């Protein structure tokens, strides 16, 4: 996604691809595109939006703002749809990095999916929630001894090896624990997905995985086979995020299965018979804006499964089990962030033009993606109806940073005012999980809504939480 052009130019004078088309009527500003907003979200005749039967005005009054609101049915339905598309929950590993708390871990468990974690903290939350360790896979490019030890002691299903150092480290830890740990090797296949540079992870110049092109991946595989306490059960690859087509996956599968063929040729069918998994990672895209059009999950799954079957048959191998790791595709669409408008300011940027800034009570501390990735979002007035004409505005946060932007350019009702509630769609992935305490602003609460009821999932941080980290007397 491209950043909005910088510089003091009036927003309405910009003819940039990222500036949305001007709505033709006030009613158009009120529309909530079903491909972007949660499944159980509707706007009433009074303009107030409800999610799963709960008005957002009630949520804001009870829990405060900013507030993350999760449509539980939306999250669970996406779990079921993806599991059905890929042949069962055991082949779908929810990527905890998108968003994890104990409640989410329980939902994922109840829907029969497996779970990917990337740190000791994510592992601890999953185990605290009672998630079965045997269905957990541990990722990460720099797993510490403590993290690997905790994983082995918990009995996790798989560890994805990311370096040769880690092979020796994990072999020693598993040996000391008296277990044989199932592992996959993460292979860098040289595919750069058509996405933002910072989240494209399978090209060569990056910190993840072991290169196929240089032979590092095969060398790592040889080292795993030489250990006493590791069992290689498959190969892993991840080519990026927010991907809308299968072209990159097809190339990745071709190269990973080609490597699997070489491994079988070198070590023999008997010794490699347990290598039954090809994990193509995550990266399945979602709609952030009304015109976004990712493929239906069943269509994407059918294509990926056929690619793996075809590539395996081409090299004379039995079809391995295809594993995928969706995070955003499950967590992203069913959550919105509620903000309260604090100030509205028209700033002159030339003798004849101005820019409207709508400031809300959160910002880059609860959603860094706009600043970090130039991400785009759909934002709407959700607390009332308005027949005012559209005005192009920039929704910004309250932090001491000029780049603190929630939505760079969006059309709002011209009468938007302090006290109004703004909803930002599709914030369930990589918003709370990447949140911070910048300016010592406390993290928002998270609530789940279902069947007309709302319940607190994560409470709002307080000043007492901030002060609890202080060491008295120093």
Curated annotation (Swiss-Prot):
InterPro entries: Ala_racemase/Decarboxylase_C, DAP_deCOOHase_LysA, De-COase2_C, De-COase2_CS, De-COase2_N, De-COase2_pyr-phos_BS, Orn/DAP/Arg_de-COase, PLP-binding_barrel. Substrate binds at residues 328, 369, 373, 401, 430. One of its GO terms (biological process) is lysine biosynthetic process via diaminopimelate. The active site is at residue 400. GO terms for molecular function: diaminopimelate decarboxylase activity; pyridoxal phosphate binding. Pyridoxal 5'-phosphate binds at residues 283, 325-328, 430. Pathway: Amino-acid biosynthesis; L-lysine biosynthesis via DAP pathway; L-lysine from DL-2,6-diaminopimelate: step 1/1. Residues 1-25 are annotated as: Disordered. It catalyses: meso-2,6-diaminopimelate + H(+) = L-lysine + CO2. Residues 9-25 have a biased composition (Basic and acidic residues). Pfam families: Orn_Arg_deC_N (PF02784), Orn_DAP_Arg_deC (PF00278). Its cofactor is pyridoxal 5'-phosphate. The modification N6-(pyridoxal phosphate)lysine is found at residue 97. Specifically catalyzes the decarboxylation of meso-diaminopimelate (meso-DAP) to L-lysine. Homodimer. This is Diaminopimelate decarboxylase. It comes from Mycolicibacterium smegmatis (strain ATCC 700084 / mc(2)155).
